[in-house]
Structure formats: structure tokens, C-alpha cells
């Protein structure tokens, strides 16, 4: 086996740029919630296959991070729950009914709890392993990345 050592990184020559347009009214027929987006997730299902869900309704709760909820991004019917080896969760598919009926939230006044109930807690990432933080943890610092510099990244001025 040949060993390759790189010093100073690798410069990949990428040419071109991202097209500057926004697709309006893109509503797919099926939405998937993938377990690979949540490292270490031990899911507890709050709904089952065939259940009707609304936007913001909790679908899964993490057993290891008590209280962390994953909510439905669309309204519709849970069409399938896909499992792999040892019944590990692979994905949850939701058939979009395109009605976008909302799940009613109770605002408690606690910012962390309200973010979790709204399904926004998974937007936070804990360093250095890029995991969803524990619900009860209090951060020492918060880093806000307002502009990514990855190759072929979308221009933030177009979005704003």
C-alpha cells in the first residue's frame, strides 16, 4: 500500500460558481428525517406509521438527551419508518399533504425550552464534535458563523 503525505493541505481546483436563482414554491411530495443527521440518536417514537402530523409536531425524542425533540417540518401522514440492522433508525418518511397545518406550541418563557419545542434546538452544534448539545447544558461561548467560505457555497447576499 502506498502512503501519501500532504503538507499544507490540498488545493482542489474548482471552477465556476453557483447559479444565482432561487426556486420558488418547491414542495416535495415526501420529506425524510434521516438519523445520520443526529449522531448518537437513540429514538423514542412519539408517533407511528400512518399517523397524521402537523408542522412542528414532535415525532421523535432522544432517549440519551432527555427532552430533545425532532419535529415534523411539514404536515401530512407518516408514510414509513425505515430501520436497519438491530432495528436502528434509518429514516422517517412523511407524505406531504401541502396544507401546512400548524401544531400549537405553548410558550413557557424559557428560551432553551421554547427553542426545543419549536424544533430549533438541533440548529445548535457543540464543539469539537459537531453534535447537538445536551438540553440541560449551558454554553460558555456561542459562535455565530454568518458567512461560509466553502467552495461553491451559495452567496449569502442572494438569500438576504
Which sequence ranges carry the predicted segments?
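N-terminal, Lys/Arg-enriched amphipathic/low-complexity engagement segments
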Residues: 1-46, 61
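Short, Lys/Arg- and Gly-enriched loop/turn segments at beta-strand edges
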Residues: 62-73, 87-90, 102
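Glycine-/proline-rich flexible loop or hinge segments
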Residues: 55-63, 98-101
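Generic structural motif
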Residues: 37-41, 53-56, 65-80
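Short, solvent-exposed cationic patches
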Residues: 24-27, 77-82
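Acidic, glycine-anchored pre-beta loop/turn
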Residues: 47-53, 82-85
Amino acid at each position: 500500500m502506498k502512503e501519501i503525505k500532504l503538507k499544507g493541505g490540498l488545493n482542489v481546483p474548482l471552477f465556476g460558481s453557483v447559479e444565482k436563482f432561487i426556486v420558488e414554491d418547491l414542495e416535495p411530495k415526501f420529506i425524510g428525517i434521516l438519523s445520520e443527521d443526529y449522531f448518537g440518536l437513540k429514538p423514542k417514537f412519539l408517533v407511528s406509521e400512518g399517523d397524521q402530523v402537523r408542522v412542528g409536531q414532535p415525532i421523535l425524542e432522544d432517549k440519551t438527551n432527555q427532552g430533545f425533540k425532532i419535529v415534523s417540518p411539514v404536515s401530512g401522514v407518516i408514510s414509513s419508518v425505515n430501520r436497519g440492522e438491530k432495528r436502528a433508525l434509518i429514516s422517517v418518511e412523511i407524505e406531504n399533504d401541502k396544507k401546512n397545518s400548524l401544531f400549537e406550541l405553548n410558550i413557557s418563557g424559557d428560551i432553551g425550552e421554547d427553542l426545543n419545542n419549536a424544533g430549533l434546538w438541533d440548529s445548535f452544534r457543540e464543539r469539537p464534535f459537531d453534535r447537538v448539545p445536551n438540553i440541560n447544558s449551558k454554553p460558555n461561548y456561542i459562535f455565530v458563523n454568518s458567512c461560509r467560505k466553502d467552495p461553491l457555497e451559495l452567496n449569502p447576499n442572494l438569500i438576504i
